[in-house]
Amino acid sequence: MFCVQCEQTIRTPAGNGCSYAQGMCGKTAETSDLQDLLVAVLQGLSAWALQARELGIIDSQIDSFAPRAFFSTLTNVNFDSDRIVEYAKDAILLRHSLAVRCRLLDSTITVDHPLAELQLVADDIPSLLQQSQQFALNNDKADVGDDIHGLRMLCLYGLKGAAAYMEHAHVLGQSDEQIYAEYHAYMAWLGTQPRDVDTLLNNAMGIGKMNFNVMAILDQGETQAYGDPQPTSVNVRPVAGKAILISGHDLKDLHMLLEQTQGTGINIYTHGEMLPAHGYPELKRYPHLVGNYGSGWQNQQTEFAKFPGPILMTSNCIIDPNVGNYGDRIWTRSIVGWPGVNHLDGENFAPVIEQALGMAGFPYSELEHLITVGFGRQTLLNAADTVIDLVASKKLRHVFLVGGCDGSRTERSYFTDFARSVPQDCIIMTLACGKYRFNKLDFGTLEGLPRLLDVGQCNDAYAAIMLAVKLSEKLGCTVNDLPLSLVLSWFEQKAIVILLTLLSLGVKNIYTGPTAPGFLTDNLMAILYEKFGMQPITTVEQDMQAILGH
């Protein structure tokens, strides 16, 4: 096992990365190694998808399957070895079918790629584990050096994040042939074990640019289906009655669950990254979408154990449900998996509903505590003139984007302290689950504008980017000249690709934490600082002083 993709990876003087029987996330060495094998198979599939395009063959099934299967290898998504093997088998079947179609047009066709003809050596996991050792991500690290290896990981993990957003967009009926072509090109290229520093850096930025377009179609899919988010008050305390908790990012799953639970007397609660759903007009119209439950994903083993109903996981993040003894009432969907728990293959949530009806639910309603969400792209753009007027009249000094992933590291209290320290003449935009560090605090208003603006899920960084672009256009300056600072927390691969997106757009002077990614060497961090001014957080006082200048 070798995995260095998340923020909580093991760090030692000898090197970084989880390399024992189990990773810090709970992923076993078996599952980790099989995921490496799956990635290699998917790189070969992408090589064929590229070759097929030269013959005019575009296979929509492969285009949707490839990023979905890749998504299953993200942190805290799928821990089920059997499911990972099934993805690999399906990938090879799809590749074989595509090769047959290509050879009908050109019988001499070959694909010049080291993984183009990769086959699984057997069906049994012990044999596949032995085969997977060929594809361990650190196999040639000693040969190529830490910097090259780190840049490869930056590209690989960034592409994983983009693949996740591609799948979210696909679920909502959004696709783009050019995006799929770029995805396959980057995926196939990574399978060649690239060694050139400049190419690696350029392609990391290319993956970021591609992801900007992915986030655009995802935003389009969400707003076309459910309307533009509107500022909405959300109760974060329990309401008496039977209950289902839904977590993850998949708004379509939430919509289907709301439809199927109408009239049942079951209340639906959002968790984690599902919180922004309350701002969408077509979702918040359901009266039994009663509120949000819990906090950051890392606290789920305690919070889920106390929830008196079933829990539906639609995407990341899932962690071991056996710790809190709720494994019998957690249900996984789509790419999510945990060995031994219930998995829903289709879109019928009847088993979840039946389980909820058989449970007690919350015995009484607690006193309401309301927070506000729904400051999505259109709402932010509509507020652009107000923001400009406040800046011009010197009533608004600075805007901070403080958000990203949450996690269990104690150093993450920095983000709570930072938000608390933002002066009264400044506002905070936030997004992703990092908001749970401070989103239940009362920040008040500034000239009628809430000082805390919840922009949405991690992919809604797109909304913040579009606001920054509009403000810069109206003010006749660059984004980097705006009174805007980004202070981002990272944990997994979606955060990595959002960072690459921001850098690819030329956004500079981003603060990141709580630690540097384990795969980025001091040399690489120095390059990112030199090119983009990207720097690790220090102390709240020091960073605030550097940003505001006094």
Curated annotation (Swiss-Prot):
Chief site of localization: cytoplasm
Catalyzed reaction equations: A + NH4(+) + H2O = hydroxylamine + AH2 + H(+)
Gene Ontology CC: cytoplasm
Cofactor binding: number and manner: Binds 1 [2Fe-2S] cluster. Binds 1 hybrid [4Fe-2O-2S] cluster.
EC assignment: 1.7.99.1
Chain positions recorded as [2Fe-2S] cluster binding sites: 3, 6, 18, 25
SUPFAM superfamilies cross-referenced by the UniProt entry: Prismane protein-like
GO molecular function, one term: hydroxylamine reductase activity
Modified residues annotated as Cysteine persulfide in this record: 405
Pfam families in the cross-refs: Prismane (PF03063)
UniProt KW keywords: 2Fe-2S, Cytoplasm, Iron, Iron-sulfur, Metal-binding, Oxidoreductase
GO annotation terms (biological process): response to hydrogen peroxide
Obligatory cofactor(s): [2Fe-2S] cluster; hybrid [4Fe-2O-2S] cluster
Residues the record lists as binding hybrid [4Fe-2O-2S] cluster: 249, 273, 317, 405, 433, 458, 492, 494
UniProt entry tagged with the keyword Iron: yes
Role summary: Catalyzes the reduction of hydroxylamine to form NH(3) and H(2)O.
Record-given protein name: Hydroxylamine reductase
Species name: Yersinia pseudotuberculosis serotype O:3 (strain YPIII)
